[in-house]
């Protein structure tokens, strides 16, 4: 009989998983409610935990709080850090905001090629603002920046093993305009 107590119980495992998932969901809901009430400090505290657990939406939201100085001291460096994490997880709004930070030299050295790269990733996911920003940046880029942007895309595609036939970056395909 003692051996039976040591066997895993599927119902207990499912209950534990549901509890774990509902805890994360509850924290996200608490963060959203706090933000909507204007309690940005509480939202930041709730988001911090989720962001550290790898939640891309929470990373973006926390980056936005640092970017705007709501509930936390305004910090370009912290905003950049959280946007970068979320962008690396594929969050299109973070990719767009990260691109803007590179375009404007906000918390990072101004770099049109990096800016173009990040807004292109966001545009590929349907972000209309990113599409406009990508087109605007393209007009400002030098041939050297175009070459660097192509290299960023190649490296990214190699690292992520993306299909190079996608519309990720028109520059990679040698098109003259986005």
Q: Which role does the model predict for each range below?
A:
Residues 21-46, 178:
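N-terminal leader/linker segments that initiate helical-solenoid repeat arrays
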Residues 130-178:
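Terminal, low-structured helical/coil segments at or just beyond the last alpha-helical repeat
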Residues 60-61, 93-100, 112, 117, ...:
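Alpha-solenoid helical repeat scaffolds
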Residues 34-39, 48, 52-55, 68-70, ...:
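Short helix-capping/linker turns of helical repeat alpha-solenoids
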Residues 29-34, 49-50, 61-68, 97-104, ...:
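Hydrophobic face of amphipathic alpha-helices that form TPR/SEL1-like repeat modules
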Residues 10-22:
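Bacterial N-terminal signal peptides
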């Amino acid at each position: 009989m003692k051996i039976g107590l040591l066997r895993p119980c599927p119902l207990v495992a499912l209950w534990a998983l549901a509890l774990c998932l509902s805890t994360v969901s509850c924290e996200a809901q608490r963060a959203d409610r706090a933000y909507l009430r204007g309690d940005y400090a509480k939202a930041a505290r709730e988001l911090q935990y989720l962001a550290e657990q790898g939640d891309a939406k929470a990373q973006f939201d926390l980056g936005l709080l640092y970017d705007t100085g709501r509930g936390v001291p305004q910090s370009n460096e912290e905003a950049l850090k959280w946007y970068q994490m979320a962008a690396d997880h594929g969050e299109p709004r973070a990719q767009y905001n990260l691109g803007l930070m590179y375009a404007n030299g906000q918390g990072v050295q101004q770099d049109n090629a990096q800016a173009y790269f990040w807004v292109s990733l966001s545009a590929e996911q349907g972000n209309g603002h990113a599409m406009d920003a990508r087109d605007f940046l393209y007009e400002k880029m030098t041939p050297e920046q175009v070459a660097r942007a192509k290299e960023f895309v190649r490296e990214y595609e190699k690292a992520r093993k993306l299909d190079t036939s996608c519309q990720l970056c028109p520059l990679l395909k040698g098109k003259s305009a986005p």
